[in-house]
Amino acid sequence: MSGGKSGGKAAVAKSAQSRSAKAGLAFPVGRVHRLLRKGNYAQRVGAGAPVYLAAVLEYLAAEILELAGNAARDNKKTRIIPRHLQLAIRNDEELNKLLGHVTIAQGGVVPNINAHLLPKTSGRTGKPSQEL
């Protein structure tokens, strides 16, 4: 007889799974946790805080990259450059508010011409004049 109470099947060893994989995230939960601990933001850091923060950062990155990809496609380009990031952020109301004081290197400016500076179009629709 073998020692131990439990009979039946032997316990199958589980392979190690990262916290990012458990949460279904691409961003590194372990690294975010380490940065929160080393950053002196608080004396203690809960277990759920780095998971939540990594999820928020992943969502923001995905949102910005999707809009920048659309801007690149509109300009018939396949590579996202800083100009596309600038256009994506400045044309989105919420992202512009969040990143309002951020300067993007090589981003340029958003094209905008004041309506007063545009040439005035005539209101006539092409009726011939009655003058001789």
From Swiss-Prot:
Keyword DNA repair applies: yes
PROSITE patterns referenced in this protein's UniProt entry, alphabetically: HISTONE_H2A
GO molecular function annotations of the record: chromatin-protein adaptor activity; DNA binding; protein heterodimerization activity; structural constituent of chromatin
Modified residues (N5-methylglutamine): 106
One GO CC annotation: chromosome, subtelomeric region
Free-text description of this protein's post-translational modifications in UniProt: Phosphorylated to form H2AS128ph (gamma-H2A) in response to DNA double-strand breaks (DSBs) generated by exogenous genotoxic agents and by stalled replication forks. Phosphorylation is dependent on the DNA damage checkpoint kinases rad3/ATR and tel1/ATM, spreads on either side of a detected DSB site and may mark the surrounding chromatin for recruitment of proteins required for DNA damage signaling and repair. Gamma-H2A is required for recruiting crb2, a modulator of DNA damage checkpoint signaling, to DSB sites.
Site location (Not ubiquitinated): 120
Sites of N6-acetyllysine modification: 5, 9
InterPro entries the record matches: Histone-fold, Histone_H2A, Histone_H2A/H2B/H3, Histone_H2A_C, Histone_H2A_CS
Motif ([ST]-Q motif): 129-130
Keywords for this protein: Acetylation, Chromosome, DNA damage, DNA repair, DNA-binding, Methylation, Nucleosome core, Nucleus, Phosphoprotein
N-acetylserine: modified positions: 2
UniProt record, GO biological process: double-strand break repair; heterochromatin formation; homologous chromosome segregation; mitotic chromosome condensation; mitotic DNA damage checkpoint signaling; mitotic G2 DNA damage checkpoint signaling
Disulfide bonds, paired cysteine numbers: none
Signal peptide (UniProt feature, chain positions): none
Keyword DNA repair: yes
Subunit annotation: The nucleosome is a histone octamer containing two molecules each of H2A, H2B, H3 and H4 assembled in one H3-H4 heterotetramer and two H2A-H2B heterodimers. The octamer wraps approximately 147 bp of DNA. Interacts with mdb1 (via BRCT domain) in vitro; this interaction requires phosphorylation of this protein at the S/T-Q motif.
Miscellaneous field: In contrast to vertebrates and insects, its C-terminus is not monoubiquitinated.
Family: Belongs to the histone H2A family.
The name this protein goes by in its record: Histone H2A-alpha
Organism from which the protein derives: Schizosaccharomyces pombe (strain 972 / ATCC 24843)
